[in-house]
Design a protein with these regions (language model features):
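Glycine/charged-rich beta-loop-alpha catalytic/anionic-binding loops adjacent to active sites
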Residues: 78-82, 114-124
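Structured core elements
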Residues: 21-23, 35-37, 44-46, 66, ...
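Short, Gly/Pro- and small/polar-rich lid/capping loops
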Residues: 1-37
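A structural signal for small-residue-enriched, beta-sheet-centric alpha/beta enzyme cores
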Residues: 109-110, 128-132, 142-146, 153-241
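Glycine-rich, flexible beta-strand/loop modules in the N-terminal catalytic cores of phosphate-handling
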Residues: 26, 34-111, 201, 205-219, ...
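Short flexible coil/turn linkers enriched for glycine and charged/polar residues
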Residues: 16, 28-30, 39-41, 61, ...
Length: 241
């Protein structure tokens, strides 16, 4: 599919990702960690493994993977309040999405009765914080599980595949990949795709923020998303090499 020439930040094409950098092992005490950078968006992802599972999971002889998400106060242009007991609905929605996404590629029986918590802290936000979180969280999770294998606590890494996420949208009538904040803040259509390395979708979130969209536009957005996911999956592999 051909895309119209549009004027985007950094001279990006409509179907081009922002510069993406995935840096592993950035935290000394985490079992696995990754700094995920999508342009000016930066998310610190840290995975910790603990013995035992939530009470409702006991007796299942299977593990659990969960996530927490938060934005640091100075991560945006205007200071956002630090979250304490009163969690923001948006943050809770995103951390549930991260947890769901990761669980789809974990063999819980092979994990055994361990709980993995992946903390995703946004240190700088410029759009796409949830997609950067998921992409970096998978690497942090993978490295934490690999550490447990090396320690003799697991026989093998209980992963069935990779997971990455990317945003798509319609801005000023143009179908775009990987929106930054300036684009996302006035997008007519906003969409997020979470998918595996085999191309299977885990979650698709799409909203006509300012205008409805038809099946043709949806297909174009999905084509962009597939392209972005494939590139992110390859970047994850390169980070592991």
């Amino acid at each position: 599919m051909e895309y119209m020439q549009v004027n985007r930040a950094n001279g990006r094409a409509a179907n081009e990702l922002r510069p993406v950098k995935l840096t592993r092992g950035v935290m000394k005490h985490a079992h696995g960690s990754c700094l995920a950078e999508f342009g000016d968006t930066r998310v610190l992802c840290a995975a910790t493994i603990e013995e035992g599972v939530p009470g409702w999971r006991k007796g299942a002889k299977a593990g659990w993977v969960t996530a927490e998400y938060a934005m640091l106060p100075a991560s945006t242009g205007k200071r956002c309040k630090r979250e304490h007991a009163n969690r923001k609905g948006r943050s809770m929605e995103i951390e549930r999405l991260i947890g769901r996404s990761l669980r789809t590629v974990v063999n819980m029986k092979a994990l055994g009765e361990y709980t993995v918590t992946v903390d995703c802290d946004v240190i700088q936000a410029d759009g796409g914080t949830r997609t950067a979180s998921i992409t970096g969280a998978w690497l942090a999770l993978r490295d934490a599980l690999a550490m447990w294998v090396e320690a003799g606590k697991l026989e093998r890494i209980p992963l069935t595949g990779q997971v990455a996420a990317i945003s798509m949208g319609v801005v000023d009538g143009n179908t775009l990949l990987d929106l930054d904040y300036s684009e996302d803040s006035h997008a007519e259509v906003d969409m997020n795709l979470v998918a595996t390395d085999s191309g299977e979708m885990i979650e698709l979130q799409g909203t006509g923020e300012q205008a409805p969209f038809d099946r043709k536009r949806l297909n174009a957005l999905l084509d962009l998303g597939d392209k972005g996911i494939a590139e992110l999956i390859e970047l994850q592999r390169q980070a592991l090499a």
